[in-house]
Each structure stands twice: as C-alpha cells, then as structure tokens.
C-alpha cells in the first residue's frame, strides 16, 4: 500500500510541475516594453514573441481599436506603420505622437488560449519659451511685478528668474489642466531710473529638454521724470563764429517737445531751431544772453540754462591765455604754501629738540662745577690744617 501511495504522490507532484512549466511557457509567449516619447516625435512599440507558431497576432491601441491584424492594417491612421513582423518580434512606429496617444497598447497572441501584454506609452510635453507678463507699468521709486508662465507641460516644468546671473526668488504656482500643467513664477522688486533697459531672464527646465533650457528675456521698462542738459559745440566763441547748442534729454517716456527760450528777451532772428538743436550760423555781440531748453513728460519737467558770451577776436585770445595761467598759478601758490608750512614745522621741531639738549648739558656742567669747587675747597682746608700743625 505504501509503495502505491508513493507512486501516486510522485505523479501528483510531476503533474503540478508540468502545469507550472506550461503556465510559465505560456506567459512568455508574448512580452511588451513600456516606452516614453516627447510629443511630436516618433516612437517604436515592440511586442516580443516566444515560441511563436504562426498564430494570430493583434495589436490594439488604448481604446481597444485594432491597429494591425496579423500584419494587416486595420485602422486608417497612417501615423502607425508596421516596420517588422517576424517569429520573434512585431514592431510598429508611431509618428507625430500626441498626448491623446498615451496609454496601454495591447499585444495579443491567439493560441489555444488568448495571451496579451500591455506596452504603456507615456507622452511628455516639453515647455515652449516661457511667457513674461508685467502687472502694471513700473515707475521710478515704485515696484515692478513680473510673472513667468509656462502654460502647457508634462510633467510640470521648473521656472526660475535670473538677473545679472543671480537667481531671484519668486512665488511659484501650479495648475493642472487634464494631463498637462500650467506653471507660473512671479517676482517683485523695487526699481529706479537706472534699472530702465536692464534685462531679467525667465528660464524653464524640463526632463524632455535633456539639460537644455528654454529662456525668455525681458527688458525692464521703468518710467521716470526727464532731465535736460545744454551742451555747446564750442566753449569760447567770437563774433562771426558758428555755434550749436544741443539740449541732451533723458526721460521715459522720452519728451517729444523741446522748448528753447532766451531769458528776458526773444530768440535772435538768425537762430535756427531743429528739435534738440539751437543753431547760430554767425554770432554777433547782440546774441549775448542766457538761453534755456525746457522738456516735460507725464512724470515731471526739467530745464537747463546756458550763458552765451560772444567775444571780439582780441578778447577771445586773452581769455584763452588767461584761463590756463590762472589755473597753473593757483596750483603753484598752493604748493608754495604747503612747502612753507612744512619748513616752519621742521624748524620748530628742530629748535625744540636743540633747546632740550642744551638744557640738559647746562645742568650737567653745574653739577661738575660744584663738585670741582668742593674738591678745591677741600684741598685748601687741608693745606691750612697742615700749616697750623707745623
């Protein structure tokens, strides 16, 4: 009885092993690989066959529409192309992959039992160049708020602000739109007129970019009140010379109108105005006076004055020779004064040190003199004592 039970157990175990082996063999008849593709690119979907015996192979899309039936096209979507069908593998190419193509593709093998594997297709959406929006017009002394936007990415992109190669910390928000994300990064900072025209950069990074960055540069537009400055074409002029006065203007918005006037008088008839230029083709002594240019915009106004002095030929030569010598003379006088001060200090220090030395020397002589006198007096007394005893 015992040998019979042992044989029965062996048959049972062998049957279990055969079933497990058969199940393993069947599970390996078809295999699929998960793939990832960038939106708009081409991707390959593969179904690997094991122990293929010519049975029917069907490839279906995520909504279970049949793409290929045993190598024959079944769906009129020409973006799907069968590129290989052998006893080991079935390969199809999907061109211009879209987000709607994402999902599980079924590799089905019809034998005595139906076996299938799912190849999961993941479509990632890289960001375009980010958009930059400004909340309101910036004015000097105020703040500016800029928002960088990446409206459609998958997975969510990372946005950063940079200025002068230094990152600016901002506030980031994320909004989900179906399978994609909209990302924003906002910054605020104080601005002055010197910031007008400076560049800030918004940078987007994403796994699909493979280490590259998408950037958008924004030129700061900071409005400020105008300034005016008159610059002459030459500083010294004489009767008959030509002179151009230019009113150099800054401001945002830039002033479009420049008003030239003459203090307490009208402009000379010969003077010509061409925008920021006030020209005198031929000067004479009657053109002497104070000239002014005035500009304005919505943030303020500004003006500058220039005193015009027209010399005759002799006066202009004298003025040209006196100005350099006056400057040089002033410099030389200052140097002489400094040298005299230094000499006085040196002499005072020298006299002070010498007086101290003479005082000490005199004190020493007095001491030696007293000692010598005492010695001599002592000698005389001794002689007197000797004479007395004799």
Swiss-Prot record:
SUPFAM superfamilies xref list: Immunoglobulin (SSF48726)
Keyword flag Membrane: yes
Keyword Repeat included in the entry's annotation: yes
GO cellular component, one term: cell-cell contact zone
Keywords recorded for this protein, A-Z: Cell adhesion, Disulfide bond, Glycoprotein, Immunoglobulin domain, Membrane, Repeat, Signal, Transmembrane, Transmembrane helix
Function as written in the Swiss-Prot or TrEMBL entry: Involved in the cell-cell adhesion.
Protein name per the record: Cell adhesion molecule 4
Organism field: Xenopus laevis
Gene this chain is encoded by: cadm4
